[in-house]
Amino acid sequence: MPAYNRNERRKSMAERRPSASYAPSKIPHLTGLEKPNEHSLKLDHCDILILGTGLVESILAASLAWQGVEVLHIDHNNYYGDSSSTLTIDQIKKWCVEVNQGKVRHFSDAQIYIPGGKRTNEFNSKDYGIDLTPRIVFSQSDLLALLIKSRVYKYLEFQSLSNFHVFENDNFKSNISNTTKEHIFTDQSLSLTTKRSLMKFLKFVLQDNNDPDKKQLLLDNSQVPIEEFLTNTFGLKSPQSDELIYSIGLANRNGTRTPEAVARIKRFLVSFDVYGNFPVMVSKYGGPGEISQGFCRSAAVAGTTYKLDTTLVDFDPQLKIAKFSDGSSVKIQEKVVAAPTQVPKFLATSYKEASEKLHPFTVTRLTTIVRKDCREWMSENESSAVVVFPPESLPTHNAHTVQVVIQNGGSGVCPQGQSVWYSHTCEQNAEKAKKDLESAFEKMENAILRESATNLENLLDKKDFVVNDRGTPMLVNSFKLGESLQSFVPKETLDIVCKFGYVQTTYVNPDLSNVLSSSNATNNITQATVSDTDDIMFSNMPSSEISYDGIISEVKMLYKRITGSDEDFFDVDFEDEDDEYERAAASTSAVIDSESDINDDSDYDSVHHEPFGAGAMEL
């Protein structure tokens, strides 16, 4: 399939019309998107060859290019993003087939269900941008700081996310916004003792990490589970402890060590009021896939050569000559960096040897597109929310947290009136993980149908409400699932556009310890060496972390191995470069053709759309 095939993709960031309130500078065009692929590579040498355009690889390419390194960046796919891609539904269908054929390393058990197929379930594939590894970005984070420093933020749009819901006692609640003194002391559902305990704990979390009392307390409790620490030290128990640990801290399991949990909770708290009254943002039109593309554009302006639909077929470590599937040969002066999904066949044994001593971790994902915008779960003027199911909160007795990111049409990932539910779990037993995800989906389905029902007026009673500080009656929880609604059966059913799930393997620990801590770097494949050459390096698969934490740390590990130091990582005065940058961006232009429609039923197969021949999806 030609790489420059506009029928299979959504409009790129350079082609789409930005929001009225957002006026980006000239966005440079990118090979394989606005500019067609060259038939063969037009260079005879480069310093660094990078295989795969995932988020880590794209940031690495830009960081090297802006230091004057000649980078050749290729991808065997005909789209950008690799394992961090943002894909249309048709692309996802083909991706699932490739996964199950064993063509996509580190992914398995991909299943997709389109109720009724496209004959009765009408939709335009290109109206959807679905992330393979969805992420949220904290307002106070190293990735966001780099986006601003590198000027890549100019190519992106971000939206606030302030609603975090936690599921407990068969109810959805959103009390975790109670993270300020004002909120805590005006919350009538909390006792005075609990309010004081919360304030004491939040004050402790926000203390400087170098405070001697805080350091000693964390050291004394370094191996103590956070639940035990909250109870013994601050007198906090469930439900407040659950909200702190799993919604604010976004921990993925119970028994998280106290220092890690406190750091996670602080991440949330210090992100408030950085850009507004919210802690988290999401990138519009897609997550890691959009950001990957942004860094690729930056790298291209700095001189990186790009080519999609191209594979490395051979590399001579003595002559340092790389041969590619398009017939071209290029001398690689320094290093080759390969993403796990892009490792060529001749390096498969080397990759296996490099990773054989590493512990694999699985993350199981279930993504569902529904014809309901779920505005009931979101703050006014926002288009995203997070739902968390703590351990033991589901009928399946989930041992790990189920985390769900919800985005509706306002985020540009689907049509208006619809939403995408991204759920995942770190449960290592795949069958158990699938049951947990299905159970969480059913709870959310029942909740949104109840929430959006129009005949609720006579079902609520006084105990479903509390009075806020202004004297206004308010529902006890965000989803209106008071006790009197537990037996309410909505008349409608949830209309599903598409539902698909898959299992991903990574060598990044769910707690990110082998990425964030230099003492555990030996357990990271970025530090592994190939037996017959020092010139080949591997990057990691995306982690199970819901945020972008750990990404920059991993990029810096690779950058340091290549250059010898990470002190000059993105050490560029972009303010002085802005004029030159804008001229370079403006000079890259191409004629943008109108996209033609896809034949909706061209590859419809009811058996493959309904796994195991079932009428409903079984994950």
Give residue ranges: language-model regions:
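Glycine-rich Rossmann-fold phosphate-binding loop(s) that bind the pyrophosphate
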Residues: 52-55
